[in-house]
């Protein structure tokens, strides 16, 4: 008898949900204490006979990286939410898995799927900031950018991957390295802690002609850690640091930001992502549970608009709208959908995943009104924008907590999200919302 899906008064019913607790060929010790991360393959194979789409989830545990196939029903209008778990992982439940790739001696903290048929298939980052490129059919990395600890490097600052939501205010800087990939996949920017007393650094790295070649190193002054890096297009990217400042850069220009956005209020700026579809929208998340939606064009224009600041005041950079996690649940990750310009999810320190739709806020937004106050998180806007809350279903541990890079949108299949929990439970789901009806 299938277990029933967990329900509450919030929108948490599913169009589809399946989960798998993997078995492994080799014994895996201390599963709960091993770092996990998750992404999807972009390969999708339709099966008209069975009315399914087959793809795969890429899941890391410590130094081992696994590929797990799944099949979900073809996109159809759902008449009602499901009551039971699906069988997307049918045939895999009793299969013992062997690693597809191994980053020996490292703990994988983030992955990005590149191209199954290309020179490189998967890019992974270890928790000390090293990068490794893997190719289909080869178990070990074919390129590596290694980060070694020097005598002046703080072990804590470079190796601690503690959740931002768990850290005291003063210790948030002991967090994270990250990387971003340009839209054409030809350039990578990685962030790196450089030790307690030194600036964090950005490395601009070739991913085309000579994958792994460091093209330039940029210091981010006044910061200990730059925890998030994201590209808006092929050249413009932004970095988010522990001084609560977003810096916007151009890989073609000098080693100084082209403009900045300061966020001194609302707690620590813990997460940031930009839309892969619009190129203008981005979202910031805070340790206090506050979420802000921004228009990059308006925020940049405000830096040169002196109309209301003739005496040297800071730029008036207002977000489009703000939202919040109930109960002050900290924002530990945020990701825009790869298939929709208006949808993103946030991950709370509780492990809950909040699905947001920005259509309501954008319908009230006038980009030409440069001094309009932000749309505050009223009950109406919160209700219309928070479309779904994933608490994980009945199979998830009640002790689950939120971590970066453990949830992901599928890059091709609309509204499909994957997660991995501390106990290795891998789940994929599609929310059931009003749009599903």
Swiss-Prot record:
What the entry lists under InterPro entries is as follows:
WD40/YVTN_repeat-like_dom_sf, WD40_repeat_dom_sf, WD40_rpt, WD_repeat_RBAP46/RBAP48/MSI1
Gene3D superfamilies per record: YVTN repeat-like/Quinoprotein amine dehydrogenase
What residue spans do the WD repeats cover?
A: 103-144, 221-259, 264-304, 326-366
Q: Which residues carry this modification: Phosphoserine?
A: 200
Q: Where is the composition biased (Basic residues)?
A: 387-402
Sorted alphabetically, the keyword list is: Cytoplasm, Meiosis, Nucleus, Phosphoprotein, Repeat, Transcription, Transcription regulation, WD repeat
GO cellular component terms, semicolon-separated = cytoplasm; nucleus; Rpd3L complex; Rpd3L-Expanded complex
Give this protein's Gene Ontology molecular function annotations: histone binding; transcription corepressor activity
Q: Where in the cell is it found?
A: Cytoplasm; Nucleus
Q: Which GO terms describe its biological process?
A: chromatin remodeling; maintenance of protein location in nucleus; meiotic cell cycle; negative regulation of silent mating-type cassette heterochromatin formation; negative regulation of transcription by RNA polymerase II; positive regulation of transcription by RNA polymerase II; protein import into nucleus; regulation of DNA-templated transcription
**Where are the Phosphothreonine residues found in this chain?**
187, 370, 406
Which stretches does the entry tag as region Disordered?
368-404
Concerning SMART domains, the annotation shows: WD40 (SM00320)
Q: Which SUPFAM superfamilies match?
A: WD40 repeat-like (SSF50978)
**PANTHER family (alphabetical):** WD40 REPEAT FAMILY
The record's subunit annotation is: Interacts with KAP122.
Say what the protein does.
Transcriptional modulator with roles in meiotic regulation and silencing. Acts either as an adapter to facilitate nuclear import by KAP122 of the RNR2-RNR4 heterodimer, also called beta-beta' subunit, which corresponds to the small subunit of the ribonucleotide reductase (RNR); or as an anchor to retain RNR2-RNR4 in the nucleus.
Q: What more does the entry say?
A: Present with 7750 molecules/cell in log phase SD medium.
Q: Output this protein's name.
A: Transcriptional modulator WTM1
Q: Which organism is it from?
A: Saccharomyces cerevisiae (strain ATCC 204508 / S288c)
């Amino acid at each position: 008898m299938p277990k029933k899906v967990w329900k509450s008064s919030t929108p948490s019913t599913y169009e589809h949900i399946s989960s798998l607790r993997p078995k492994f060929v080799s014994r895996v010790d201390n599963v709960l204490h091993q770092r996990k991360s998750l992404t999807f393959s972009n390969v999708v194979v339709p099966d008209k006979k069975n009315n399914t789409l087959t793809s795969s989830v890429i899941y890391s545990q410590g130094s081992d990286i696994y590929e797990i196939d799944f099949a979900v029903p073809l996109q159809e209008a759902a008449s009602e939410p499901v009551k039971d778990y699906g069988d997307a992982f049918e045939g895999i439940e009793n299969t013992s898995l062997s690693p597809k790739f191994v980053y020996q001696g490292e703990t994988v903290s983030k992955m990005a799927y590149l191209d199954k048929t290309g020179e490189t298939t998967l890019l992974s980052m270890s928790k000390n900031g090293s990068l490794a490129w893997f190719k289909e059919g080869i178990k070990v990395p074919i390129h590596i950018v290694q980060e070694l600890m020097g005598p002046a490097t703080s072990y804590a600052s470079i190796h601690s991957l503690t959740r931002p939501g768990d850290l005291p205010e003063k210790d948030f800087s002991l967090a994270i390295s990250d990387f971003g990939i340009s839209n054409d996949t030809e350039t990578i920017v990685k962030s790196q802690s450089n030790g307690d007393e030194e600036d964090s650094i950005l490395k601009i790295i070739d991913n085309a002609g000579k994958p792994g070649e460091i093209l330039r190193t940029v210091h981010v002054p006044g910061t200990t850690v730059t925890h998030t890096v994201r590209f808006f297009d092929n050249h413009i990217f932004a970095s988010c640091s522990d001084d609560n400042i977003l810096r916007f850069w151009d890989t073609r220009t000098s080693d100084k930001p082209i403009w900045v956005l300061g966020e001194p209020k609302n707690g620590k700026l813990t997460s940031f992502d930009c839309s892969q579809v619009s190129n203008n929208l981005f979202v910031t998340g805070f340790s206090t549970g506050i979420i802000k939606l921004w228009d990059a064009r308006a925020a940049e224009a405000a830096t040169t608009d002196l109309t209301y600041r003739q005496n040297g005041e800071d730029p008036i950079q207002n977000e489009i709208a703000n939202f919040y996690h109930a109960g002050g649940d900290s924002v530990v990750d945020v990701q825009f959908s790869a298939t929709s310009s208006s949808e993103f999810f946030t991950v709370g320190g509780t492990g809950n995943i909040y699905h947001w739709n920005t259509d309501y806020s954008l319908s009230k937004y006038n980009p030409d009104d440069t001094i309009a106050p932000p749309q505050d998180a009223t009950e109406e806007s919160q209700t219309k924008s928070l479309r779904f809350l994933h608490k994980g279903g009945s199979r998830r541990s009640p002790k689950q907590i939120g971590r970066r890079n453990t949830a992901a949108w599928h890059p091709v299949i609309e509204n499909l999200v994957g997660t991995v929990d501390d106990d290795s439970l891998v789940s994929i789901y599609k929310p059931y919302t009003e749009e599903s009806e």
